[in-house]
Amino acid sequence: MSKVCAVFGGSRGIGKAVAKLLAQKDYKVAVISRNLEVAQAAVTEIGAHLALSCDVSKENEIQCTFKEIKNNLGNIDYLVNSAGISRDALLLRTRSEDIMSLLSINLVGTIQTCKVALKGMIQQQGGSIVNIGSIVGHKGNIGQSIYGASKEGLIGFSKSLAKEVAKRNIRVNVVAPGFIRTDMTSDLKEDSLNKMIPLGRFGEPEEVAQSVLFLLESPYITGHVLVVDGGLQLHL
């Protein structure tokens, strides 16, 4: 029987690549985005099964989203949290509303989706969660103090949750990408940054998706942070 996977932030970038790979592996995939039309377009393009809209900063929308997935596809086996935003600025120039948005979407939203997903996973005595972090959470970066805090907070949350639910046969892991060629990195000077990366190039979303799939399916890995950065951390 095909496993059911919910991919938050699954309409673009890394999340879309994950959803596409899971659909190719014959999983039942729900693509969740804040924009329903964008989610529907992604589902049509990649051959997923269900498109839903959800603002992860709103708990009631998360609850409704999981109910829709269960009603249409069944109990969720895999959860991937790839929804996220960036608002790069030096801390002294960062607006208070941007601080709250970054933490609300990148960290609290993931915490809330995990909390709701766990109810079903505990009932079925098993499940796997992969949260998308960032190398910035590990190493820090100028102009990304709040973004980095949200991603490092995600790592601490995931490791603690992994300890809480391991006895329930539920695994929780993190993939921490470096520079990946997506909309979020389109304004970066790729040629100069490539010099910092031992492998000499930005990664592709599909390469991160392979790492996500590996952690979702690995039955004896939990509480792990898998860095996918072409060796960038060796230079930071």
UniProtKB/Swiss-Prot annotation:
For the keyword Lipid biosynthesis, the answer is: yes
Designated name of the protein: Carbonyl reductase family member 4
Q: What is its main location?
A: mitochondrion
Its taxonomic path starts at: Eukaryota, Metazoa, Chordata, Craniata, Vertebrata
* Family affiliation: Belongs to the short-chain dehydrogenases/reductases (SDR) family.
Q: Which organism is it from?
A: Xenopus laevis (African clawed frog)
Q: Name one GO biological process term.
A: protein heterotetramerization
Subunit comment for this entry? Answer: Homotetramer (in vitro). Heterotetramer with HSD17B8; contains two molecules each of HSD17B8 and CBR4.
- Record's Gene Ontology CC terms? mitochondrial matrix; oxidoreductase complex
Task: Tell me the residue numbers annotated for binding NADP(+).
Answer: 11-14, 34-35, 55, 82-84, 147, 151, 180-182
What pathway is it annotated to? Lipid metabolism; fatty acid biosynthesis
